[in-house]
Regions:
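Active-site bordering "gate/hinge" segments
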Residues: 2-216
């Protein structure tokens, strides 16, 4: 792979185009509207989440919650001035937890269809002692401080803009000392969209960006 890799080639070879489209375009938002938040990221609405939690508590239980996460991670590396690695990883799934006394049941699914989520809920709820279905409260969104006040998401920065930045770092390192002959520079970033909903009615969403620039 040479240093002229295009964004189209990067997205195509890494199969991240659809994942990037699946994440909500809400840079710096600690909470989002229902239409542009959890539904866009996971394809679920509050009614479906309530049904899943109700299924988790069908046999009883003190509490149940469901955790959704959609993470897109990319990495670009430069060695001897040329791109030698470009990767992209996608993580998508949901976990259902049921608590009864000191017992906890947990099940996970990478498929976010209603059938798969209800199946995970049933598996997690199997630890309950069949004491009768417990209720699910009305959801109320919680707000939290914006710990990631970015003006531009990394997923919006094309490879054509990343490569020149890495080359500037490469040239600065080589120019800092004549004894430096070889430099490796890499940029890794990730964005996670998270949703947690509990049978007690708590509903929280978060967007978690991270980035790391490495030089050796």
């Amino acid at each position: 792979m040479d240093g002229t890799i295009s964004r189209r080639e990067f997205v195509k070879t890494s199969s991240c185009g659809l994942a990037a489209l699946g994440l909500p375009s809400l840079a710096g938002a600690a909470a989002a509207s229902e239409e542009r938040g959890h539904f866009q990221a996971f394809g679920v609405d509050r009614e479906l989440v309530a049904r899943v939690l109700a299924r988790a508590l069908l046999r009883g239980g003190d509490f149940a919650d469901i955790y959704f996460e959609h993470t897109l991670s990319t990495s670009l590396a430069l060695e001897d001035g040329d791109v030698n690695r470009a990767t992209c990883d996608i993580a998508l799934g949901a976990g259902v937890r049921v608590v009864q006394g000191d017992q906890t049941g947990y099940a996970y699914s990478e498929v976010l269809t209603e059938e798969a989520l209800l199946s995970a809920a049933a598996a997690a709820g199997a630890i309950a002692a069949d004491t009768g279905a417990a209720g699910v409260g009305s959801f109320e969104a919680t707000t939290s401080p914006d710990y990631s006040p970015l003006t531009r998401r990394w997923s919006e920065v094309s490879v054509d803009h990343r490569i020149p930045m890495l080359r500037r770092v490469n040239e600065a390192a080589l120019g800092s000392d004549h004894r430096i002959k070889k430099v490796r520079v890499s940029l890794s970033d990730s964005e996670s969209w998270v949703l947690v909903a509990g049978s007690d009615g708590r509903w929280a969403e978060d967007w978690r960006p991270m980035a790391r620039l490495s030089l050796s």
